[in-house]
Amino acid sequence: MEVPGSSKKMIATQEEMSAAKIALGSRDMCAHLLIPLNKCRQAEFYLPWKCEDERHVYEKCEYELVMERMLAMKKIREEEALAKQNKLQGNAAVPLIPKTANA
């Protein structure tokens, strides 16, 4: 399964995520990294220094997804600003009320 607009592919299946009891909010393109991280956390009694490598890889994946979304939103905002600017310039060519109307 591939999400439109994302450079990453879904690797973990719905069945794998369901079996690993991954929360619905965490079922994104990095879920395949969260499954071994949660297994490590449970095996090591959630000691923060035990699963550093798995956590680092998972958090880097999440960071890359956030940055990808931010760049996409920035591009959308730039396109909207350009469209708005073009619309304003198009209206300026044909004034509806002459500037001398205030006299």
UniProtKB/Swiss-Prot annotation:
Covalent S-S links between cysteines: C30-C61, C40-C51
Pfam family of the protein (one): NDUF_B7
Membrane topology: Peripheral membrane protein
Stored InterPro entries: NDUB7
Compartment(s): Mitochondrion; Mitochondrion inner membrane; Mitochondrion intermembrane space
The UniProt record lists the keyword Chaperone: no
Entry function: Accessory subunit of the mitochondrial membrane respiratory chain NADH dehydrogenase (Complex I), that is believed not to be involved in catalysis. Complex I functions in the transfer of electrons from NADH to the respiratory chain. The immediate electron acceptor for the enzyme is believed to be ubiquinone.
Entry comment, domain topic: Contains two C-X9-C motifs that are predicted to form a helix-coil-helix structure, permitting the formation of intramolecular disulfide bonds.
Assembly and interaction partners: Complex I is composed of at least 49 different subunits.
Protein name per Swiss-Prot or TrEMBL: NADH dehydrogenase [ubiquinone] 1 beta subcomplex subunit 7
